């Protein structure tokens, strides 16, 4: 009925009101990504029903059985068709405040239902089968995101930035909590660790990208296509491909090793402790190692040459979080992961650590307008990390924490001025190459304007 109501809305927009034509918000790109994610959900369930795929949840895990699967599948295909139509027709739609309000109200009711479902399901507060659906709930948040984006698209030119003011304060804690809660619920429901890890991170990242597009910290930090292509290559090749070849970093490999006898020789880890306590302890200890490795990257010139690849961008946004030289990434892994593998840390603990690590990392580098208040004394969030990327060397030599800021506070390197914001980010070298391969070799060919030991 919602879509029929929206379809009946009588609106005639002038060419200047066409959705997305002059907007800096990439509506179609955002909606397309969400559509692909939902299409993945629809296609994977019948595949695992026919073939056993170890990295994916079993057939029954994909739905709560509140509806017979044939009926559910037909509804999913209908929804997917509407989503595809929305992506294709978006540039030709006009603005309509009525359609926007209908979608917004529907979206918020949908949010309330799914949050209720998540809380009740995670803590076993009901025996009803509807509250067994961890995996479907994750994909319901994909649909919620689609509805909310479409709502804003229909009100383009009418919405005020102040409408998103609460996202400054709630965006970070809500998305971090949501990602972690979905992860714990999925593994509790029997989903494979790798699948639960990646899906939780993807859901959190979708939310971060939406936040930074609808309530950005700085318009000049919005990426262009020429920025996203090399960033995507860094994420795929450096963060996934190369670590896989080296048996480093990616959750799938770490989880495999964490469950093997090879890494349990030292097995001093307190496995009997509650899972959340183990994750918190791993975060605290790993941050100590990462703090000193990261600080060395800035204070020891040969290491800075490698790390400069990460700092070279003059913008901060979600997708350039993965911009690391392969050697830089390998060195960092040696400090924050290998010790825990050798100590025999359980695979669930390591997987949970990486969910927080990844979602916090995406948020940390995002262009989202964020105000964390007292949390800035605990986590290394966007407000703190932007100072770390400052072109002014005295400001950049601060806030080394990767996930937590506790060790910066202890060692006196925490920086968060109250009266101003960071001016420019980057390394000051305007000639630094932008292509993927050219950045890989840049440590050998390019100087940085501010050497860390000067």
Model-derived regions, located:
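N-terminal membrane topogenic signal
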Residues: 19-30, 161-174
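Hydrophobic cores of alpha-helical transmembrane segments in multi-pass integral membrane proteins
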Residues: 27-55, 62-92, 102-120, 135-156
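Alpha-helical transmembrane segments of multi-pass membrane proteins
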Residues: 38-49, 180-185, 207-213
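Alpha-helical transmembrane segments and their helix-start/interface "positive-inside/aromatic belt" motifs
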Residues: 21-35, 100-104, 226-239
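Short, intrinsically disordered terminal tails adjacent to the first/last structured region
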Residues: 1-19, 438-454
């Amino acid at each position: 009925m919602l879509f029929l109501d929206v379809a009946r809305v009588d609106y005639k927009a002038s060419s200047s009101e066409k959705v997305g034509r002059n907007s800096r918000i990439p509506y179609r790109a955002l909606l397309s990504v969400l559509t692909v994610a939902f299409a993945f959900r629809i296609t994977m369930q019948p595949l695992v029903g026919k073939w056993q795929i170890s990295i994916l949840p079993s057939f029954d895990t994909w739905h709560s059985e509140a509806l017979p699967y044939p009926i559910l599948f037909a509804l999913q295909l209908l929804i997917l068709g509407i989503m595809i139509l929305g992506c294709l027709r978006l540039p030709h739609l006009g603005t309509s405040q009525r359609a926007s309000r209908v979608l917004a109200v529907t979206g918020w009711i949908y949010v309330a239902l799914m949050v209720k479902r998540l809380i009740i399901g995670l803590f076993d507060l009901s025996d009803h089968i509807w509250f067994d659906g961890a995996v479907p709930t994750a994909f319901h948040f994909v649909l919620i995101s689609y509805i909310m984006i479409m709502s804003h698209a229909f009100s383009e030119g009418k919405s005020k930035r102040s409408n998103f003011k609460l996202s400054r304060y709630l965006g970070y804690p809500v998305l971090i909590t949501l990602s972690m809660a979905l992860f714990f619920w999925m593994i509790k429901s029997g989903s494979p660790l790798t699948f639960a890890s990646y899906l939780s991170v993807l859901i959190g990242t979708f939310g971060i990208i939406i936040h930074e597009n609808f309530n950005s910290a700085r318009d000049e930090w919005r990426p262009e296509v020429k920025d996203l292509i090399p960033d995507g290559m860094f994420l795929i090749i450096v963060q996934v491909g190369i670590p896989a070849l080296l048996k480093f970093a990616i959750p799938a490999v770490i989880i495999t090793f964490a469950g093997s006898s090879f890494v349990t020789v030292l097995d001093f880890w307190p496995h009997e402790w509650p899972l959340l306590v183990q994750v918190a302890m791993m975060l605290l200890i790993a941050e100590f190692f990462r703090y000193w490795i990261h600080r060395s990257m800035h204070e020891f010139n040969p290491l800075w040459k490698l790390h400069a690849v990460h700092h070279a961008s003059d913008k901060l946004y979600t997708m350039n979080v993965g911009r690391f030289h392969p050697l830089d990434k390998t060195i960092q892994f040696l400090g924050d992961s290998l010790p825990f593998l050798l100590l025999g840390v359980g695979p669930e603990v390591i997987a949970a650590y990486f969910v927080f690590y990844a979602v916090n990392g995406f948020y940390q580098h995002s262009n989202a307008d964020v105000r964390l208040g007292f949390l800035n004394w605990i986590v290394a969030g966007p407000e703190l990390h932007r100072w770390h990327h400052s072109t002014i060397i005295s400001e950049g030599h601060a806030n080394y924490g990767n996930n937590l800021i506790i060790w910066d506070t202890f060692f006196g390197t925490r920086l968060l001025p109250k009266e101003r914001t960071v001016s420019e980010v980057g390394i000051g070298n305007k000639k630094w190459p932008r292509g993927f391969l050219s950045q890989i070799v840049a440590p050998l060919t390019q100087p940085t304007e501010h050497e860390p030991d000067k």
